[in-house]
Amino acid sequence: MQAAPCARRLARRSHSALLAALTVLLLQTLVVWNFSSLDSGAGERRGGAAVGGGEQPPPAPRRERRDLPAEPAAARGGGGGGGGCGGGGRGPQARARGGGPGEPRGQQPASRGALPARALDGYFSHRPKEKVRTDSNNENSVPKDFENVDNSNFAPRTQKQKHQPELAKKPPSRQKELLKRKLEQQEKGKGHTFPGKGPGEVLPPGDRAAANSSHGKDVSRPPHARKTGGSSPETKYDQPPKCDISGKEAISALSRAKSKHCRQEIGETYCRHKLGLLMPEKVTRFCPLEGKANKNVQWDEDSVEYMPANPVRIAFVLVVHGRASRQLQRMFKAIYHKDHFYYIHVDKRSNYLHRQVLQVSRQYSNVRVTPWRMATIWGGASLLSTYLQSMRDLLEMTDWPWDFFINLSAADYPIRTNDQLVAFLSRYRDMNFLKSHGRDNARFIRKQGLDRLFLECDAHMWRLGDRRIPEGIAVDGGSDWFLLNRRFVEYVTFSTDDLVTKMKQFYSYTLLPAESFFHTVLENSPHCDTMVDNNLRITNWNRKLGCKCQYKHIVDWCGCSPNDFKPQDFHRFQQTARPTFFARKFEAVVNQEIIGQLDYYLYGNYPAGTPGLRSYWENVYDEPDGIHSLSDVTLTLYHSFARLGLRRAETSLHTDGENSCRYYPMGHPASVHLYFLADRFQGFLIKHHATNLAVSKLETLETWVMPKKVFKIASPPSDFGRLQFSEVGTDWDAKERLFRNFGGLLGPMDEPVGMQKWGKGPNVTVTVIWVDPVNVIAATYDILIESTAEFTHYKPPLNLPLRPGVWTVKILHHWVPVAETKFLVAPLTFSNRQPIKPEEALKLHNGPLRNAYMEQSFQSLNPVLSLPISPAQVEQARRNAASTGTALEGWLDSLVGGMWTAMDICATGPTACPVMQTCSQTAWSSFSPDPKSELGAVKPDGRLR
C-alpha cells in the first residue's frame, strides 16, 4: 500500500521526462528539417523519382552567390534593396543551396578583366517569383523517353518535396501554418506541377509553386492551372444541362471555354456520356481472321520502272493551311500528272491560301477545291470529318475514276517519281497502306488518350472525362497519313453496318481520330486481309525536340510533332529497304535547300542561270485580308518600313531641282512578304502606294527592308567562348529552335523571350541582364548551361507596358561581359487599327508603373555595370511618350532607322521616276521570277515538272 504514492511519483516523473524528450526530439527534427531543406535542390538532382518515369522533376529553385564587383559608396544600400535583391534576408540560405553540376559554390575568385569595382557582398542575380511561366522549357528539358510521361493536363503527378524558401525564414509555428495553408491550397486544385528542366535551366530565387500561391495572377497561369474548385463554376447556358456536372475535366473545360455555344455543347456532351447515351458499349467485328493481319509487299527498285498495262489513277487529297503558297505550288508541281486527280481542302482560317488555290484550280481540269471548309486544328475531330467528307465527294464525282486515295499536306514532298508510285500501287491495287503504332494495344490506348472523352469546339479539343473502349473489336492506330483503295473507301463512306456506324460515333469524340479510325475499321472489317503495315512515307521524328507539348493551347493533351528535314537528312530518302514514296515535314522558311536537293534528285537540275532557285518568298499580309488581320504592332511597323523606303528613294534616286523620285505615302500597305536567300532571313518586302510629287499620280512600289546586325561579342573578348549567338523575340519554336516572329516585331505589350545558342564546353553559369532604353535594369537572372546544351531560352515576367525604344540584353560570365544583343520595342502609331489617341499613347509608351518591371529594383547595379540613368534621357522619354501624329511617326521612324536598313525600292507598274527599277526585273522582289514554284502548261509527258 505504501508503494502507490511512489509509483504515482515515478509515473509523473516518467511522464514529464517523456514530454521533455518529445519536445527535444521535435525541436531537433525541425532544426534538421530546416537545414536539410536548404540543400533540397542538390538532393533532387542526385536522385529521386522522375516525373512519369522520364527525367527528374525540376530542382528546387536556388540562387548562386555571384562574384560581383562592389558598388561605389553612393550606390551601396540604395534602390530599395535592389543590390541585395530584395533587401537582404537571403544570404546564408541562398549560399547554402549552392549550384548545380559544374556550378561553382560560394565565393568565386575575381576574373581578370572583370568590371572595375570592389566586390559587392550578398548580391544574387535575380529571377523574380511574381509570375508563373510554363513556356520557359529550355533545351533538353523533355524526358528522353517521352512515352513514359503522362500526356494529360489533369492527371496527378508525383514530385519530390521542393525547398520552400519562405518556410526556412519563419519560426516553427509559422512554418506549420504555411505548410498547412499550402496543403489546403493543393487540395483545392491551386497547385501546379511544372515539367522537369535539365540543361539550360534558369536559376530562380524562390520556389515556383510558392510564387504561384503568393503572387500568381489568374491571367499569368496556363488555362488548365486556373482554380476550378470542387463544383461547377457559375456558367450561363441557353438550356441548363440535364445532369450535375461534377467531373474535374468537364468543370475545367467549362471554365476555359470562351463562347456560350461551346459551354452549352460541353455540358450536353458530358451529360449524354454520363447517362450512357453517347458511347457504344459493344461493336461487331466482321474480320474472319484471328489476330492482326499484315500483308507483306515486295520492294524491288527495278520492277517499278516499267509502267503496267492498266495503271492506277490516284486521288490526291491535299489538306492545307497557313500562307506558304509557293511551297504548296512547288509540291503540287512535283506530284502533278494529268492522269491523276487533286482535291484540295483549305482551312477556313487561311483565306489568303484559299485565294491562291482557287487560281490553281482554274488552270487545270483535274484540280478541284472543296466547296466547304473546316478549321482542321491539330488533333481535332474536324480532321477526320474533313477526310470522310472528301471521300464522299470524290465517290460522287462520277467523272473522276480514281483507284487510290492519298492524303498529303503542304509540308509533304515526293521522294520517288510518279511513275514509280503508279507502278507500285498498280501491283498492289487491292491493298490498303497504313502504319501501325507497333506497341501493345493497351499502352497505345493509354498514350493516345483513346480511353478519354474529347469534344471539339471553339477551335479547341476539350477533355471531358474517361470512357471505355467498346467491347468486341481490336483497337489499332498509328500514323494519320495513309493510302486507301477505292473499295475500302466506299465501305467506310457508305456502309451502315454496326462497325462503321458505331466507330464514326466513337471517333467523333476522340483526340487525333485520323490516327486510329481507319486502322480500327480496316482491322475489324471484311477488308482486314488487305492491310499493309506501311504508309509508304518517311516521317522525321525527333522526340527530343518534337515532344515539347507545343499544342496544349489547342488540345487538353500533350502531343508530339515531327521535325523539318534538313540537308543532312538527305541520305534517308535514298534507302531501298522498304517502299517509301513521300516524306514529311518540309518547311521552306526553316530550310529550303533540302527541298531543292530532293527536287533535283527526282527531276534533274534547272538550267544554269535560272533565277530564284535560292530565294523564297512567303506572304504574311495581303490587302484582301483587311487590316483587321494585322496587329497594331505589325501595322505600325509596316507603315514605318514603307516610309523608310520612300526616304531611300529620295536620297538615292532623287536629283536636285526635280521631284520625279519624291513620294508621299498613301493608305495602308497592300501586301507584305518574308524574304529569304540561301535559307537566311533577309527582311520584309512591303508593297505600298505613294503619290509621286512630280506628277501627283499614285504609284505602287515595293520596299525591301533588312534588319541590322545587333548581336555583338564583348571587346576585348572574354575567355568564355561557348556563346555563339543571342537573340530576342516572340513565338519561340522549341522544335525548330527559331523565332516564328521573323524580324522580331515587338510592341509595348509583348512579352519577349531571350534565346542563347551555345557551343560545347564545360558546365557554366551565366548572368543575363535586361536593360531598357533609359538604362533601367528590368531583369537579371542566372542560367545553368550544361556541357551538352545547344540552346536556352527564357521569358522574364516583366511588368507591362515595356518602354518603347532600343533595349539591350547583356550576357556575363563571372560578371565579365561576354556579349550583348539589342531589340526594338516599337511605339505604336495605331490602336485597334486606328490612329492612336494621346491618352492611349501616354498609357502605352511611358513604361510600367513607377518604372518597376519587377517587384524588386536593380538600381544599385547601374553604377556597377556603368549604366548611368541620365535625367535628360528620362525627360526625353517622357516627352516622347506623350507624342502623337507626325511627332510620334518621327520618333518611331528614327528608332526603326537605327535597327533596319532600306536595301532597295522598285515599282510594280508605271512610274514617273526615271531611275526607278521595275520589280519584275530585280532578284529580290516578290514580283521577280520564281520558276521553281510557277505553274505552267502541262508537258507532253503529262507532268508540270
From Swiss-Prot:
Could you confirm whether the keyword Transferase appears in this record?
Answer: yes
PTM description? Contains 7 disulfide bonds.
UniProt cross-references to Pfam families, sorted A to Z: Branch (PF02485), Xylo_C (PF12529)
Give compartment(s).
Golgi apparatus membrane
Q: Which reaction does it catalyse?
A: UDP-alpha-D-xylose + L-seryl-[protein] = 3-O-(beta-D-xylosyl)-L-seryl-[protein] + UDP + H(+)
Question: For side Cytoplasmic, which residue ranges?
Answer: 1-17
Membrane-spanning ranges: 18-38
Specify where it is mainly localized: Golgi
- What pathway does the annotation place this protein in? Glycan metabolism; chondroitin sulfate biosynthesis; Glycan metabolism; heparan sulfate biosynthesis
EC annotation from Swiss-Prot or TrEMBL: 2.4.2.26
User: In the record, what terms sit under GO molecular function?
Assistant: metal ion binding; protein xylosyltransferase activity
Q: Which GO terms fall under biological process for this protein?
A: chondroitin sulfate proteoglycan biosynthetic process; embryonic skeletal system development; heparan sulfate proteoglycan biosynthetic process; ossification involved in bone maturation; proteoglycan biosynthetic process
Q: Write out the entry's keywords from A to Z.
A: Disulfide bond, Glycoprotein, Glycosyltransferase, Golgi apparatus, Membrane, Metal-binding, Signal-anchor, Transferase, Transmembrane, Transmembrane helix
- Write down the membrane topology: Single-pass type II membrane protein
> Where are the Lumenal topological domains?
39-945
What are the names of the required cofactors? Answer: a divalent metal cation
Keyword flag Isomerase = no
Gly residues bias spans: 76-103
Q: Which residues are glycosylated?
A: 212, 407, 763
Q: What superkingdom heads the lineage?
A: Eukaryota
Locate the compositionally biased regions of type Polar residues: 149-158
Q: What are the cysteine partners in each disulfide bond?
A: 243-271, 287-528, 547-560, 549-558, 661-913, 906-919
Q: State its role.
A: Catalyzes the first step in the biosynthesis of chondroitin sulfate and dermatan sulfate proteoglycans, such as DCN. Transfers D-xylose from UDP-D-xylose to specific serine residues of the core protein. Required for normal maturation of chondrocytes during bone development, normal onset of ossification and normal embryonic and postnatal skeleton development, especially of the long bones.
| Similarity annotation | Belongs to the glycosyltransferase 14 family. XylT subfamily.
Describe the subunit structure: Monomer.
UniProt-recorded name of the protein: Xylosyltransferase 1
The organism named in the record is Pan troglodytes
